[in-house]
């Protein structure tokens, strides 16, 4: 049986990993064994952080809405309760955008929520 030479396949595999590791510091971008570990770890971080990004943005939106609501004399939880009671369905992303950039519009929404609670 003939000997199988894997030079072409190995080079292709190495080039693929080293291409993914381009821009990494030191041996992480040059040495195959280290680069492979770095690429695997980077993939794990990317997977984890795609999920964390959703949580972090929601927390940011809530913080911005809370700040805007408190300026208008209402806490976040009371504001959200008022919106639910008034059946105003605006998501937190849009509310946060309004609280930061459209203060007058946000104040009007807070007043509606306040009126519903009273």
Swiss-Prot record:
Matches recorded under Gene3D superfamilies: 6.10.160.10, Ribosomal protein L20
Gene Ontology CC: one annotated term: ribonucleoprotein complex
Pfam families from the UniProt entry: Ribosomal_L20
Cited PROSITE patterns: RIBOSOMAL_L20
InterPro entries per record: Ribosomal_bL20, RIBOSOMAL_L20_CS, Ribosomal_protein_bL20_C
GO function term, MF aspect, one: structural constituent of ribosome
Keyword terms of this UniProt record: Ribonucleoprotein, Ribosomal protein, RNA-binding, rRNA-binding
Protein family according to the UniProt entry: Belongs to the bacterial ribosomal protein bL20 family.
Function: Binds directly to 23S ribosomal RNA and is necessary for the in vitro assembly process of the 50S ribosomal subunit. It is not involved in the protein synthesizing functions of that subunit.
Protein name: Large ribosomal subunit protein bL20
Protein source organism: Pseudomonas fluorescens (strain SBW25)
Gene symbol of the encoding locus: rplT
């Amino acid at each position: 049986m003939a000997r199988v030479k894997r030079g072409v396949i190995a080079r292709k595999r190495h080039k693929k990993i080293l291409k993914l590791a381009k821009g990494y510091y030191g041996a992480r971008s040059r040495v195959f064994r280290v680069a492979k570990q770095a690429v695997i770890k980077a993939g794990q971080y990317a997977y984890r952080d795609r999920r964390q990004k959703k949580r972090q943005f929601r927390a940011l939106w809530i913080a911005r809405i809370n700040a805007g609501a408190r300026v208008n004399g209402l806490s976040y939880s009371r504001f959200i309760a008022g919106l639910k009671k008034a059946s105003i369905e605006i998501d937190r992303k849009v509310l946060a955008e309004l609280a930061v950039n459209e203060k007058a519009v946000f104040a009007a929404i807070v007043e509606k929520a306040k009126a519903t609670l009273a």
